[in-house]
């Protein structure tokens, strides 16, 4: 259960940080020692966040592009399996530098399995390199670019090549979703067979396989692009 603008604890005693009902930060977890799920809104009370930051684990979402001081971001650890950063305005925004460094730190973490984002930061060369390393890990599960967010063809190709070389898997289904330019799609189709006008939908395959769908549509700026969905189904999971 999530309640907007409140701290919420589930299956545990009430946190001593849950007295205010006007703090745009939603939390689920086991008391104040370990908070397993957090959603941080744009106008978060930084002083309160500073108190709970060391206790955040497992899943963290930054909604509506919150601006958080670097010292608070430094207090948040790297023990997240899922990290999400998004801005729900009319168009994706570039991420502030301190937050960008935080997200890069998460991408380097061996705990991370799912990364979800909506931003123009995909054009950042260093982040693109981290995406490539991320999707090549056997623990990689999902890389999802929200509406209008571009993903480099190099990232998809790296994930595909890593998938082909594996003999065993730690994750049952792996997926990449986002937008690509027509030029990037050409690079992809040279190496991967795609299914036009149909996004792949996860199902239970008879064996390990992958599917790749592409659908032509305009991005947030009205530019001609392709929305892709690339999924690996791994039957033989360790």
Give residue spans per PLM region:
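The conserved beta-strand core of Leucine-Rich Repeat
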Residues: 1-238
